[in-house]
Amino acid sequence: MRRLILLACLVLFTSIQLPSLDGGERPNILYINADDLGIQDVSYNSNRYRTPNIDRLASEGMTFTQAYAPAANCAPSRSCCMTGQNTPRHGVYTVGNSDRGKSSQRKLIPIKNSVHIPQNQETIAEILQANGYKTIHLGKWHITRNPIEKGFDVNIGGNDSGSPTGGYFSPFKKGSMKSYNNQYPAGTHRVDIFADQAVKFLRKHRDDPFFMYMSYYSVHTGIEPVPEFVGKYKGKGVDAAYASMIEKMDQGIGKILSELDSLGLKDNTFVVFSSDNGGVQIISSQSPFRAGKGSYFEGGVRVPVVVRWPGKVEPGSINETPVTGLDFFPTFLDVAGIDSSEQKILDGQSLVPLLTGKGQFAERKLYWHFPIYLQGYGNIKKPEEGPHDSDFRTRPGSVVRDGKWKLHEYFEDGRLELYDLEADIGEQYNLVESHPEITSRIHADLKQWRKSMNAPVPTKLNPDYQPQ
C-alpha cells in the first residue's frame, strides 16, 4: 500500500511533461556505468589499456578531468547516483557490514550500514518512467533486490549482488544471469548478452524516449581473461586478464553506440559514461593519484566521466570543473525537461550549464561521509601510494574538497589532513600545521555540513580494540 501511495503521488506530480531544453523532441538518455574502472584505466588518460569506443565518446563530447564518485565503493556510489542524494540521506555507506576488518584493530563501533536504499527513496528511473520514458536496466544493480521495483520496465541481470555471480561467461551456474543460458551458446560473455539485449530494446523503442542504464559488472573481480583480447597484453607490463576485460567492456559499449548510429538515434541521445569508484589498487595502479577503490584519497574517488550530446556539447572539449556522480540525477531531469524545483532535496546540480556554456554553474564544495571500516587488501608495493595502513582501505571519517584544498577528518583520533591538490595531487604532504587558518575554516564547514545532513558520527569505543 505504501508503495502504491508513493507511485500515485509521483505520477500526480510528474503528470505534466515539460518540453526538452530546446523545445523539441525529448532526448533519450544512455547512462553507462562501469564497475571499479579507475581514472587511469581508459586509453584517453593512459596508454596501458585500449578503449577506442570510450575514446570515441571523448572525441565527440566533453571530458571532465576532475570528476568524482560520490563514494569509494560500489553500493554507496550507485545509491547516490540513482537517488541524487549523499550517503547520510539514504544510509548506504559501504558494501555489506560496516565493521569489516579485524575487530581488534577497530577503535570505534561503526555506524550500522543499510545494504539497500529505503523503499520510499525514489530513483531517477522512477521519475523518468512516470514522465513517459521507457526504461531498461542492464547489469549490476546492487541497491535493492530488483530494479523493476525502482522504476525500470525491463531488467537484464540486475539484483542486489555486488559481484558477477556465476562468472562472466555462460553457462551461468547461479545468479540472475542463469535464465539466459538457453538463449546464448556456451562461452558467451556477459558484455555480449547485455549488448544484444540493449540492441533489441533500442529497436523496439526507437520511437519512444528511453532511459537506458547500462551498468556493467566489468571490471569487478573475479578477473577472467577474455580470449579474444588477452594475448595482445601479455608482456606489456599490465595485468593482461584485467586489460582484456576492459577492452571487452569497451567493445560492448561500441555495439550500443553503433546501434544508435544505425537507428538514427545518435543526435537525440544524451550519453554519460562513468565508473562507480576508483580502480582496485592491487590490480591497476592509479598513480599519480593515491590509493584506489575503498579509499577517499584521490585514487579511490577520481573517476572518468565523459558526456556526449550532439549539437549541444562541443566535440573533444575538456572541462576541469570538479563534478560528482551526484550531479547526474539533476542533469538527467534537466535534459528531459522535468522541473526539479519541487523534487526531493538533491545534493548535486545540473551539468547542463557546463556542457552547453549557457547559464551559471554555482561554485560549491564536495563532501564525502563514511562512518565505517573497510578492510585493506594487504601490503602495497609502494606504501606512500596506498592508504594509511595495510589493515584498512579507510577508517571512519569525512572528507571535503574546497577549491584546491582537500581536508580529511578521521573520527578515531580526530586527525586532520589538509592537501593542496594543485601542488600535490598524490596527497603526500599534510599542510595542517603550516596552514592552521585554512584548516580551521574548512574543518568548521565540514562539521556544519555534517550537522545539516544529520550525518551520524561513531563515538562508542569498541571493547575488542587492542592498540598496537
Task: Please name every model-derived segment.
Residues 11-12:
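Repetitive helical segments and hydrophobic/amphipathic motifs
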